Amino acid sequence: MAQVAVSTLPVEEESSSETRMVVTFLVSALESMCKELAKSKAEVACIAVYETDVFVVGTERGCAFVNARTDFQKDFAKYCVAEGLCEVKPPCPVNGMQVHSGETEILRKAVEDYFCFCYGKALGTTVMVPVPYEKMLRDQSAVVVQGLPEGVAFQHPENYDLATLKWILENKAGISFIINRPFLGPESQLGGPGMVTDAERSIVSPSESCGPINVKTEPMEDSGISLKAEAVSVKKESEDPNYYQYNMQGSHPSSTSNEVIEMELPMEDSTPLVPSEEPNEDPEAEVKIEGNTNSSSVTNSAAGVEDLNIVQVTVPDNEKERLSSIEKIKQLREQVNDLFSRKFGEAIGVDFPVKVPYRKITFNPGCVVIDGMPPGVVFKAPGYLEISSMRRILEAAEFIKFTVIRPLPGLELSNVGKRKIDQEGRVFQEKWERAYFFVEVQNIPTCLICKQSMSVSKEYNLRRHYQTNHSKHYDQYMERMRDEKLHELKKGLRKYLLGSSDTECPEQKQVFANPSPTQKSPVQPVEDLAGNLWEKLREKIRSFVAYSIAIDEITDINNTTQLAIFIRGVDENFDVSEELLDTVPMTGTKSGNEIFSRVEKSLKNFCIDWSKLVSVASTGTPAMVDANNGLVTKLKSRVATFCKGAELKSICCIIHPESLCAQKLKMDHVMDVVVKSVNWICSRGLNHSEFTTLLYELDSQYGSLLYYTEIKWLSRGLVLKRFFESLEEIDSFMSSRGKPLPQLSSIDWIRDLAFLVDMTMHLNALNISLQGHSQIVTQMYDLIRAFLAKLCLWETHLTRNNLAHFPTLKLASRNESDGLNYIPKIAELQTEFQKRLSDFKLYESELTLFSSPFSTKIDSVHEELQMEVIDLQCNTVLKTKYDKVGIPEFYKYLWGSYPKYKHHCAKILSMFGSTYICEQLFSIMKLSKTKYCSQLKDSQWDSVLHIAT
């Protein structure tokens, strides 16, 4: 709560300390209401004027707005003072009894309002609901009031003394209402036909209902109607527990008729609000008018509205967030109601949801037992549940179970038949395509994202599927981007249903459908398809604002070295593409000059702009990174020629270092024994069969051993792990075949094997993490940095003989100092990793600026980017979007006022972190280019590989 002193107010005689305390309590209550509204994502700002003080309460943004408008505060204070001067000053009390009575009435009114607010909160709404004091006192178990002072019973505030009222307001945060059994009698329907008028309210006992909330507002500019005091109430329908009606009862002083303006907000009706006849851009809430029985029928004409003093209610743009929150609460109730309906249907033996008779279950305890409800949550209709209770129910959905003990009175379960979906008349609506990414395929709603189909064209089912599975990733697409994504997903569905030929090259559809018998070559359609893809690739490359290349080589079955060139580019919309650019056979020398000439020729074929080349990723061989004649050196020279001042970044593949670092362990004495014994067992069929039988007889956890190959690095860790866990069986089998291995009985050798098992498993985990699809270079760099930190931790633990992260070594350890023997090996691994990451450390500041733009220090940013980065870090809107979507999606929302920073981010996003994509291509090549089809032309192989990738 902010308090602002205004000097323009006349200083009157100071009030008593008790009066000021009362004002403080009331403002505190107003602040509590603002906090509750803020939970519904509503922005509120309130200004209260008392004597010479101005109190500002509300949400954080609301208070910031009012505090920034000091002129608005002063004008409001002057207005309040001017209005007060016009009124007749009441005579001073003769004694202090009248003042004391006035303070008591104010406190009593505040307590009564807070009780109404707590009761409304217990009903699941944020508005104040009149408290049925008489019914609560008659049936004290129906509603429990917690937090009252010890020895003080709940009753109407008019029965409390001044001290009790003050205590309640001071400790109101701990007071809450818990509804165990709702009041469902017809006479208790709030806002029903029996609602009294203002004249009648004056003679009704205060225990019947909470008084109206008086709100003073400025008159509207376009009408002479001023909004007077409004009485807000909530009417609960007995038949449908998910239906609420919010009534605003007019209390115009000059009105003698009982006219009610009733706003209906059904919890399940999804029909959009009907706009008024008067054109207005803002959406309008539907207004239902109820008049006297003696009054004439009300029309929609302007005259009718004028006669009844009805104020049109509009929903401004700044209330969209509040309406969104109401919609979420509505959906939450629908989900709970659907859950209860499905569980009740299962209880009565049907496979579809059945409407739950909440009233019959409540008033007939023992007929239906509900198990699995969260602790402290009582079963009741979703309309009576709090938001937190509904969320807990959904979390425990799989544990909730309905059991019918005996039939419910008046409910014939035998009449519940099979569900006839075809008679429900449901029709798929076109707007669901854009809202939930669903289309109708042969009268069946099908999800465009996961291709899952729904049995019924029901919006709730489609919305629940979308929000449960896809909203996290697809809510970010708005307006035009959402339409483009919908079009893209539709094309993907067509490809999924009809095959890829219609999508990739529609002009060749007949060629694939009806191949000509006169075709001379069976591979001609493949070349035509690839030709179409080459043209698309050229068009895509022209749209790149930055790109990088990755180069690696392999020897195929014909003993020919194949050089693979991949390109990774980013367009102006920050869409990333990775494509195979070319495969070049290296038949001559493999020098840097020869490789450069082949790469240059391939880049010219696609008319690539050298000035947009950002980096090159390679394996780090001398032909690639030689300082004089290496490929990277010549590429840097060429880029500098086309773009002065530009520097080509060179990245050595960081997937291979772990296999190279393994050589630094120098544990060949372990690997040689393992490889020799495993290959001897697995390479001979008889040995392998007998060994498998032995493992089966010994009831071992493995039925065989893995064959070790030096080509596959991952096989080393798997072989070592299985070898260690089958050590006794292998020793017994080798001894029975006359090939004993004395190392298998050596404690030191077994301990070295255990350390190697743990270390290779750690390296394998790193390798798998680095091989993720389409990883950003910053993510891969973070993984390597994390592994370096782990190495430092392991070294520290080994000095203390802490083997917590070496479980296999811990099993084989027999001495408290066994861990000290492997500290030098960990240190060698650290040195090797740091050496191979030296390239990344050169660009560490640029990578950090991309991955953490809002926490980067300005001093570490390049001078040409500093101004834009400062503007970005001070932009709270973009900071919120960054926290919500993260990178790289955040950069799609970056505004055009950051051109230099956007270009910097595009360059970082285009960088390859490794040549793993080349290794994927080589795997495809080994599977495709066998000795049976190795005679195809190079152009034909390019087409096959390009389609495969």
Curated annotation (Swiss-Prot):
This protein's name: General transcription factor II-I repeat domain-containing protein 2A
A GO molecular-function descriptor: DNA-binding transcription factor activity, RNA polymerase II-specific
Any one GO CC term of the record: nucleus
Alphabetized PROSITE patterns for the sequence: GTF2I
SUPFAM superfamilies, alphabetized: GTF2I-like repeat, Ribonuclease H-like
Coiled coil regions, renumbered to chain: none
GTF2I-like repeats mapped onto the chain: 98-192, 323-417
Main subcellular location of this protein, as a coarse class: nucleus
UniProt record similarity statement: Belongs to the TFII-I family.
Location relative to the cell: Nucleus
Disulfide bonding pattern of the chain: none
Known disease link: GTF2IRD2 is located in the Williams-Beuren syndrome (WBS) critical region. WBS results from a hemizygous deletion of several genes on chromosome 7q11.23, thought to arise as a consequence of unequal crossing over between highly homologous low-copy repeat sequences flanking the deleted region.
Pfam family of the protein (one): GTF2I
Tissue: Ubiquitous.
Keyword Nucleus belongs to the record: yes
Keyword Protease in record: no
Alphabetical UniProt keywords: DNA-binding, Nucleus, Repeat, Transcription, Transcription regulation, Williams-Beuren syndrome
